[in-house]
Structure formats: C-alpha cells, structure tokens
Amino acid sequence: MDVGYAAEERAMLNARAEAIIADCPGVFPLIARGFGAEPQRDALVYLRTAADNAPVTTSGETFLGLLAAAAAWFRREGIGPDDAVSILAPNCTATSIAYWAAMGAAIVHPLNLLFSQEAIAAQVNAVKAKVLFAPPPGTPGGLYEKAESLLASTPSLKRIVVLPLDGRVAFDDETIEPDPNWRQRLQSPSASGAEDRIAALLPTGGTTGAPKVVRLSNRNIVASAAASMLAYKITREDRMLLSLPLFHVGGAFCSSLSSFAAGAALVIPTAGALRNPEVVAGYWRIIENQRITIGALVPTALGAVAGVPTAGADLSRLRFFATGASVCPPEIERRFLAAWPGDSVRQVYGMTEFAGAITSTPHDRAQPAGSVGLPVALVEVAVLADGIIHRGPSPGGEILARGPQTFPGYLDERQKGAVFHEGWLRSGDIGRIGADGEVYVTGRIKDVIIRGGHNIDPAGIEDAALAFPGVALAAAVGLPDSYAGETPMLFVTAAPGATIDRAALAAFVESHILEAPARPRAIAILDEMPVTPIGKIFKPKLREIAAEQAARDAIAATLPNVRVDICASTDGERGLALTATVPAGFAAPVRAALGSLPLPFDIVAA
C-alpha cells in the first residue's frame, strides 16, 4: 500500500475541494449540497440512552427544514450575521440545530462544557453574545445554572434559551417546525453570507487563563469540512459515530460537517457520549446496531473502549477509526486493535486556528509508525529549521501550515503575536516531513499541556504556585500518562531561607485552580531550576525530568523490586525519548511497561 500521493492525485484532490468551496461559500449551501439529491436519507440519529432501540432520527429533508426555521427564529429575535450566539450544551438533536443554524445565520460561539463559571463569563463578555443556549435546569454539571447567572453581569446577553435533551427541537417552549421551503432559503450561495464572513468563534488556549477566541470564516470552515470528507472518502452510504463535542474542531468540522457535506448520517450516542459509562460499556453494540462505518475517538477514549469486550458484536461495516487531539500512544492503539481488527487507527493532526485537520492518513493509504499522515486537500506543510523553510523531507523543526483553512486572527488581535511566519501558520509543534510527504510530530515548542484532548495553559498553574509563601520559581509541564497522554506536573524552587511543605503547596494550588484537569498530578521541589543563558526557565529539561518520573512509575507498578536506570533526552529526529538500562531477563516486561507511555524509547542491557 502506498504512503504518499502522486502529483496527479494531489492535483485532483485539490481540484475537488476547490469545486466544493466555489459552489458552497457557507455552511447552509454545503449541507444542502450533501442532502439535496436524496433528502430522505438519515442526517442525524440521536440515542437518548445507550440502549435506545428507537432513536430520534432526523432525515436530511427535516434537518434542512429545521435549519431554515431556526435561522428565521434568529432573525425574529433580532440576531443578525454579525451577532454572536453562545452555546453551552451537550450534543443532542436540538443542540445540533441551534449550532448549525447559528453558524449560518449569525456567529456561533460554542463553549467548553468544562469551563468554570468565571471562564464562561469571560468568554461570553468577550464575544458580546446576545443569546446563550443551555440545557434544562438540573442537568448534571450545572450548565443551566452557570448560564443563568450571567444575565446580571453580561450587558450584551438578552436571554438564556433552554434546549431539551430528549430529542425534541424547541427553543425554550417554542417548538421549531421544519420549513418546507428550505431549498430556496438555504441552497442559494449567499444563504450563509460571503465566504469571508466570520461564522464561528471558537475558544482555544485551554480551560484556564485569559479568553482566547479564534475567528473562523465561512471559507475556513467549508475548506476544512471538504478536506476531511475527501481524505476519508465519506459518501452518503456512511454512518459516523460522533463522540467529540461541537466546541472542538474535531467534532464540529472533521466529523459532523464533513458527514453532512457528503450526505452521510451522524449518530450521537447520548448527550453524555463517552462520558456516559453506559455508552462506553455498550460501545461495540452501538456500532453494530447503528451500522456505523466511521468512528473517531481521542486517545483517552480509545483506551477506555479498548477494554470493553466486543461480545460478538458485528463490526463488519466499520471502515476505519480516527484519533486526534493528541498523539495516540502505541500501546493504546495496540490494545484497541486487539478489540477491533482494523489495520491501524488513523491519526489526525490539526489546530483550532486551522479550522480542523492539517494532516490525516486516508484509510486507503499506509500509515508509517509514528506518522500523523499527509497534508489534507489544499494544505501545504513545511518545517522551519534554523531559519530555513523546508517544504520537502526535512530535519526536525517547527511545523508550519498554510491553506484556505488558515484563520484570519483572534478576536483580540493583541494575542496574535508571532503566530505567522512569512505567510505560514506556526503550529508551535516540533516535527519533520518524511520521504513520502508524511508528517511526524515529535514535540512542542508551545507550553500548552494536553490532557485527554483538553488544552491546559500552564500559566494558571504556575501563577497559583507562585502565590504560595516561599516559592521562588514555578513551572508546569506535561507528565507523560498512559491514559490521558499527559497530566500537569509542577516544578518549584524555594526562596532563599524558605522551606516548602509539599502537601501544603499541593492543597494551596488545588484550591486556587478552578478546573480539575489543570490541577497538578505531581509536584517536584528542585534545589535549582534549569534556566537558559538569559535566565528563562528551560522547560525541555523539565519535560525530560517528568518523562523519567513517568517511566520509573510505570516500571515500578509491575516490577517494584527491579532496578532500571532511566534517561530522557531530546533531539530533532525523535523529540523527547527514553533510554532504559535493564538487567538481564527483564527487557520484555520493561518494554511492556514503557509501551503504555506516549514516548519513543530504547532498551539497552545493563
């Protein structure tokens, strides 16, 4: 099986994507294009429970009619194409209608359901949302209650609109009835506004720290969805299981909109998705019963599902699985493939600032070990190394990307900084390009910690630690983790003459960090903080220390009485890697222990 694209294949792929963008300058005409030919096909299937044998099924005809009706509702409410609509609600039929209608008729602003009250308030104030959609009062997580409290403190916010989670489509008590004239309202190229109109405002930069909002245009979004649809050859015969939230580009554009663009069905496995233990336990049976052909999970969810017996479920329709948000550890992929006998889990690499995927491995291409795939349609990838932009096979450096998916900027342009280099979007990730054009991600320049797909700004952790009496310096990095990919690890040094109590520091930091995922999993008190020649904390060294700690913990869990010397190092080829010096006879169990971590490693004899 080939790895890269021939020049003619790449040209054909790009031409198809360009044609879609030309025909569909916005989300409404794109969805209408997908279902217009066969509107009787399923568009959305919502399971109210994991064992729902009669899920709420919405045809393409009804789906488009509901979008047209919801767009008219926005107009009646005085919400226009330049107004923001915030959504703080889990996936369900009503949320989907509100989300895509808001994107077509206004500017959708989906909120991370894990946001704290303070983070939600900061976001909604930043975008000046006129309306906020939330689930009913009493919904787990207190989402409605968080939303309601904003009315008194957010001048722009006029009302909170309740979305039912039972499969009905209603905004508060007003049932939304499908508009039978959806074709004339949605199929027009101007139905969603001009291609450069901002249609979405997506939070990024984590659940902590100052609001950072990515502006995405119609063209960005359509290009992203078209590229994902073409990469995986999605057709109207497919049925995709949606396990990612709509506040994430993977759930919104790489999964949902790419399916709608092809006229394929999207299946929502309850409002809780993979946070619902019943969905995890019944995952393979859902795939069988709903005739799923495409699945997508973040690595943490892959690990959870890998431990669920298939129990004879018929998985013969399943074409492929994709994963993203962070690089999937080889051990998790191995365990998952032991349950589902596919050839590999297809890695997707992308950014919110790129409206979704930068690279992915098409299901009909070989995926070299460690690769995150090939650039998707209309995307160019390069590597910046030693001041030189390499557009072919390259040494290690910062990954760059460009294409019509590239965002025009942040809501607050002061946050833009040096995000572009000579017209290329800087990823902040370290990697290289292989001989066949495949891309490898080996590390990060940026300091964001990615815990199970959730971005955590280390500054919030560091600020909390620095407020503790006696702490002189503080730095947080990712601690490699077999389940979450990485978790926060905090390093501190004491001020001269001070003594730091680790337990007291841990309790203090936890009390000052609102988001549970951002609370440090481990704390190390150092005699001296590693710094660069100009005095800046040198985080690559801290990541090496964290990697060594994670490796020792993984080995000790199964081999508590075996001495294994661990050394972490960083280079441009492999990034952060481990070397384990192992006593005779213990290479196999040490290899198994280290295989659960998302890091390359070598075993050498003692």
Question: Which residues does each PLM region occupy?
Answer:
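Conserved pre-ATP/AMP-binding loop-to-beta segment of ANL
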Residues: 22-24, 39-42, 162, 178-203, ...
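Conserved AMP-binding A3 loop
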Residues: 56-62, 199-223
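Conserved AMP-binding/adenylate-forming core of the ANL superfamily
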Residues: 23, 43-92, 96-99, 116-121, ...
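Conserved AMP-binding/adenylation subdomain of ANL enzymes
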Residues: 222-239, 249-293
